[in-house]
Amino acid sequence: MHVLLLNGPNLNLLGQREPGIYGHSSLADIEAALTREAEQESVQLDCFQSNFEGALVDRIHQAMGRCDGILINAGAYTHTSIAIRDALAGVAIPYVEVHLSNTHARENFRHHSFLAERAVGVICGFGPASYSFALNGLLSHLRRNA
């Protein structure tokens, strides 16, 4: 099985950016832990981060026919990007939306997600463990529907 992990804008600053909200783990720490977890499940995990919407859209397109599922933390694009939503719909790959913080307990503009409507599920608010929960949920979905 092959899963793509996508991280959007400013997530490259994890561990430095607002640690009271996002914690002290770096993106590299999160990716390494999730890669180890995926390997234990015999899953290949590809990780990609970009601050650019078009680069994320391109990477989603490249996943078509190559990946069985996608984990996506689109960062602020979650609340603004119809392009990412349409790319995910276009490739028809099951995906789970993931966030470190509980977006529903934050500013009002973070309460709406353009991605959630088509997602297998949404995991938020558990810090770095959100990624592990999202991977487990996605794998469970993929195995049930294989």
Swiss-Prot record:
It catalyses: 3-dehydroquinate = 3-dehydroshikimate + H2O. Signal peptide: none annotated. InterPro entries: DHquinase_II (IPR001874), DHquinase_II_CS (IPR018509), DHquinase_II_sf (IPR036441). It comes from the Bacteria. Substrate binds at N73, H79, D86, L100, S101, R110. GO terms for molecular function: 3-dehydroquinate dehydratase activity. The keyword Nucleus does not apply. It is an enzyme of class 4 (lyase). The record marks R17 as: Transition state stabilizer. The active site is at Y22, H99. Belongs to the type-II 3-dehydroquinase family. Homododecamer. Catalyzes a trans-dehydration via an enolate intermediate. PANTHER family: CATABOLIC 3-DEHYDROQUINASE. This is 3-dehydroquinate dehydratase.
